[in-house]
Each structure stands twice: as C-alpha cells, then as structure tokens.
Amino acid sequence: LDTGCQSEAGIVMDLDSGAVLFAQNIHVQEYPASITKLLTALVVVENTSMDEQVTFSHDAVYNVESGSGNKLQLEEGDVLSVKDCLYVMLLQSSNQAANALAEHVGGSREAFADMMNEKAASLGCRESHFVNPSGLNDPEQLTSAYDMAQIGAAVFGNPTLLEICSTTSATLPPTINNPNGRTYSMEHKLVVTGDSSDENYYPSAVAGKTGYTSLAGQTLVTYAEQDGRRQVAVTLKSTQRTHYSDTKTILDFGFARFKNVSVAENETDYVTGEEPVTIGDETYSPSDLYLDEKAVVTLPNDAQFSDADKY
C-alpha cells in the first residue's frame, strides 16, 4: 500500500503486540545519525545511577565531527549529573554529553560501543552496528528501521527515559560557559508543537528523538498514543525534509487501519478444566496454563479474532 512515505525507510510498530503495521525497506541498512542516542541512553540507565557526577573530558568535548555543534557550550571540566547529561543529550542532541556519558559508563567510547552492540543484539537487532554513542558520521555506524523500532520500544518502555524523551523544555545547571544555568527546548517538532494550525501539529505524539547528518539525511523516531493504543514510528534517510510529514502519515495509517484485541477475552481453545492439556508434543496440567490478561493481538479493523492464525 502506497502511503506516500518519501523517506527511504519507514516502519510503524504496535508496542503492545509487537506487530509491524507499516513497512518500507525496514531491513535495509541506513545511517542512524542522532537517533543513536536512544540506545546510548538505554545503556546508560541500565548501567549507572542518575545522580552520579559526570566530568566532561577534553576528548568528550572536542573529539567530535567539525561543524557538529555545541549548542549549550559545554566545556572541558564541566560536571553534570547523569540525569542532566541525559536531558541534554536527548533534548538538545548534545554529542558532547553522549561522549561524556559513554566515557563515564564504559571507560572509553570504544568499550561503550561494545556495550551498545550487546544491548542491541539482546533486543533482537540483527542489522545494526554501532561504533560511537552520538551517531556522528562513520561508515560502520549502521542500523535499520526495524532495529530502531525495537530500540525505541525498549526506550519508551522505560519510565525514566519516557519521561525525559517527552519533556519539552529543561534547565541546564550552572556550567563554565553558563554560570547562571540555561533553559533549553526539545527539538522534536511533533512533540513540542501545540499550535493546531502548524503543519507539525500531531497531538498523539508523546516522545521521540531527531537525527541528521550529511550521510544519514533526516532520521526520526516517534512514540505516539491514541485511544489506548501505543505505536512507535521510525523514518530513515529523509533527504527532502519529509520526516515529520512521513511520520504523521504512517502513524495515522497504523491508528486508523488496525485495532488491538485482548487474547484472554477471546481465546477459547486453551480454556482448561480438570484434565491435562496437550499442546504439540507437550502435556500440561491445568495449573500450568494461563493467558496473560494484558496480551493483545493487532488486527485489521475488518478482521475478527477468529480469523487470526494461532500458529
């Protein structure tokens, strides 16, 4: 089905069932750019505490791609908490904060990249390889829309990271170049736009992360909620700046065309009484079997639960 998505790759995944609702080149390797920082954040929160203090080294601040920016003027010798570094990295896409966090948690950026790859593999990512925590250009830094959806699902399923990624503005504590602190805003336009007349207005958008490099083009990961349903959308290699409009289009497609149906409320084949139950080659006692009350299956709107293939 042609939705008009102009990005090279795009995906919409239902976060409650894991079903892929829209797919366009989802297993093609592309450059991720700064959406890499979602995985960086996930590794950080799983391996350190939020109140630990991070000291910015010379390498963290200055060993970045020329022209990649330093919007908050972070400097060698600055000290921020892990929490503040995460906010700066995820809202302002600070490469310096990504580097500092990687050095703090992994000991070096190279060791941290190994941790990133291990975490990605544990999430089922098979088409990704990470060599730095920021997403700056590197021919070996690759991912796919499918893998980034898996990473996004893990990030937005983490309450700490969901809170950060849905925050529209935050305050930087005093630093060397900002002695009075500084307020800054999130860059993801679908999340921050409150004007219904704006082309980037999308009230279902809750959280997300932007990305751009010369190799990657525009990349975008977006988490959205609507009528009790949760979706993550990824667009990669948008070269015509259609990443926001593409994301709105494919999220709308997922919300409009599909529904979630409770498995526990509809499954009857495995309702047990007192007798043992055989499934395949295995026999179970009734007490061994139960249906997860939260489990859902995502179906097209015109389909019934009985239409679903149980195998």
Whereabouts are the PLM-identified features?
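Active-site-adjacent loops and short helices of periplasmic peptidoglycan-processing enzymes
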Residues: 1-146, 150-159, 164
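Domain-terminus/edge residues, biased toward the C-terminal soluble/receptor-binding domains
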Residues: 125-126, 140-142, 146-147, 152-311
